[in-house]
Amino acid sequence: MKGIIFVIDGMGDRPVKELGDKTPLENARTPAMDKMVEEGITGIMDTIRPGVRPGSDTAHLTLLGYDPYEVYTGRGPFEAAGINVEVKPGDIAFRCNFSTADENLIITDRRAGRIQSGTDKLAEVINNEVKLDDVEVIFKESDGHRGVLVLRGNGLSDKITDADPKHEGNKPKTVKPLDDSEEAKFTADIVNKFVEQSYELLKDHPVNIERIENGENPANIILPRGVGAVPHVTPFEELYGLKGVCVAETGLIKGIAKIAGMDTIDIPGATGGIDTDIDSVHKYIVDTIKSNKYDFILVNVDGADEAGHDGDIFGKRDFIEKVDNIMADLKDMDDIVLFVTADHSTPVSVKDHSGDPVPVFIKAPGLRVDDVKEYGERAAAKGGLCRIRGTDVLYIIRDLMNVTQKFGA
């Protein structure tokens, strides 16, 4: 029996007027998931706790059975691990965005038009030409508009704020120390210099000149956020006795899995957006499940989250329908415990994560089937699982896999 957590990233939402006051999930045609819901058990989940807006990083740590309040140091180290950038003790790592700024350094597009090519050339300039007071700069492009920055040197601290303003129409935030240490003050100054230099180096780069000529937003500034040092995470297999693998599109999710000691699968053509090669994603998910190499599989598809951040109502709904085609192959598998969920809600009206609980369902042999017939936020709230937390998920899955021990005599 295999355990599978299938995360449709950012799927949860709120009723949308344009969809007849339904959510994108409720409005989507999802016959495969509806069938599994009819034969399974449903509920809603607060990944962290009610009202807390989870990051994708803290949400996935929780789903894998870790307490993010204990092991989470910041997003950066996980992003770095996901693209094989080493973070040594003493280093600090950041998740970065390739973004667009105008001549006054006002951020006009935090994701530089969802840039998909040319970032390797921009990263090369950053690595070769940024100079920061005896601090080594290691910068690497990730998928799409994402990148990773590692700073290496003496006297660095992760007790600093972000440069990313999180919303367009603002200048990059001035990075500030979070304590009175000289290390934090020094590091904040270093990161501010990095942001300034990134703009000067990238604004006239040939990649960006070409993008402007093509009517595309230039990727002319780097915005670091989510700083963290190396986290201390007990390997997943050591904790739970399950050999695990992660099939995901983005570096963040693969990085979390790698730091947890799990194997990862790279998917050709996967972008982490609604334009991803869904057929390739489909193939690699199904092939991994059928491989019989693993006891536990974490799956993440990211397009619904991207659409939520962009406020793309119909793009989000349509992507959910594409994911349902993948589910059609899982529907008839008998030897799996399948837990389908979102890691958080990303309402199109908010264009960011929210604290709304997410809909979940379980497909497994011998379940106590409830009366819910379709997959949606409000339907799932009537299900037999009731309202659970992310910390409950692995307990439930492992119990249904029959690999747990009795608590007590």
Curated annotation (Swiss-Prot):
Catalytic activity of the protein: (2R)-2-phosphoglycerate = (2R)-3-phosphoglycerate
InterPro entries in the cross-refs: Alkaline_phosphatase_core_sf, ApgAM_prokaryotes, Metalloenzyme, Pglycerate_mutase_ApgM
Annotated family: Belongs to the BPG-independent phosphoglycerate mutase family. A-PGAM subfamily.
Keyword Isomerase: yes
Function: Catalyzes the interconversion of 2-phosphoglycerate and 3-phosphoglycerate.
UniProt source species: Methanosphaera stadtmanae (strain ATCC 43021 / DSM 3091 / JCM 11832 / MCB-3)
Name of this chain's protein: 2,3-bisphosphoglycerate-independent phosphoglycerate mutase
NCBIfam families registered for this protein in UniProt: apgM, PRK04024.1
Alphabetized SUPFAM superfamilies for the sequence: Alkaline phosphatase-like (SSF53649)
Region ranges (Disordered): 160-179
Protein's pathway: Carbohydrate degradation; glycolysis; pyruvate from D-glyceraldehyde 3-phosphate: step 3/5
